[in-house]
Amino acid sequence: MVISAIRGGIGFLTRVPIGHDKKAWDAFRQTPVAFTVIGYPLGTIVALPFVLLSIVPVPTLIGVYLLILIGVTGITHIDGIADIGDAAVVHDTDDEHSRRRSVLHDSQVGVGGALAVTVTVVSLALGVLGATRTTPQVTFILVLTAEVGAKSAMALLVCTGDAAHDGLGAALIDESTPLSLFPVILALTPLLLAIPYLGASPTAAVVLTPLIVALVIKQWADNALGGISGDVLGAVNEVSRAAAIHAGVVVWML
């Protein structure tokens, strides 16, 4: 069951060509901990350049990181940021929930969406730039841990959220309950191994910040959209990753 869930999650969260089938997808929907588990190999892949290419100029290294991140994960989650950005600027309508939800399905990107994507990507790049002021090993662990945290933030919403409407969000959320969070928490325990390299406080910052970001976005989504959608999950992934890296760097530098 877990192996099948991980395979389904890899197909959903990445562009790795492992194939798609209903059994794996259903297993993934019923196993939120798969989000966190997948964060480990995914985080390792995107963080490797900071160790293997540490002699490369930092701007180039950050560019390589972003290219690998997009190449491995695709643009689905970034598209969620764009849709949420457009929905966030909708106001002064009789039924803001319905209007905002309709914007989520609009294929055109407005100013709000473009701004949201730009701010998120630039924030991520600047966070990684700050991380490179440490050591290659610390940067590697920060980036890896942030990826695990971002995926766990998605799992948190899946376990505790209510779906805004029928769709991808509902397909994931309807299969989980808050009790499904316990395996997610257990899956985070290997990150304790980061403490000797980052320290206890920076490690806690990188792990907890994505979860806090998820709860903040959940509150907004409940009020603005009536619940969680697939776009909200994607936005949480992107925003919490960037926030986690910034939090880790700030606490490390203190």
Swiss-Prot record:
Single GO MF annotation: adenosylcobinamide-GDP ribazoletransferase activity
Keywords linked to the UniProt accession: Cell membrane, Cobalamin biosynthesis, Magnesium, Membrane, Transferase, Transmembrane, Transmembrane helix
InterPro entries in alphabetical order: CobS
GO-annotated biological processes: cobalamin biosynthetic process
Subcellular locations according to the entry: Cell membrane
GO CC terms of this entry: plasma membrane
Entry membrane topology: Multi-pass membrane protein
Cofactor: Mg(2+)
Keyword tRNA-binding attributed: no
E.C. no: 2.7.8.26
Principal location listed in the UniProt entry: membrane
Catalysed reaction, written as an equation: alpha-ribazole + adenosylcob(III)inamide-GDP = adenosylcob(III)alamin + GMP + H(+); alpha-ribazole 5'-phosphate + adenosylcob(III)inamide-GDP = adenosylcob(III)alamin 5'-phosphate + GMP + H(+)
Entry-linked Pfam families: CobS
Pathway: Cofactor biosynthesis; adenosylcobalamin biosynthesis; adenosylcobalamin from cob(II)yrinate a,c-diamide: step 7/7
Membrane spanning stretches: 28-48, 62-81, 109-129, 138-158, 179-199, 200-220
PANTHER family, sorted: ADENOSYLCOBINAMIDE-GDP RIBAZOLETRANSFERASE
Function, as annotated: Joins adenosylcobinamide-GDP and alpha-ribazole to generate adenosylcobalamin (Ado-cobalamin). Also synthesizes adenosylcobalamin 5'-phosphate from adenosylcobinamide-GDP and alpha-ribazole 5'-phosphate.
Protein family (similarity comment): Belongs to the CobS family.
Protein name: Adenosylcobinamide-GDP ribazoletransferase
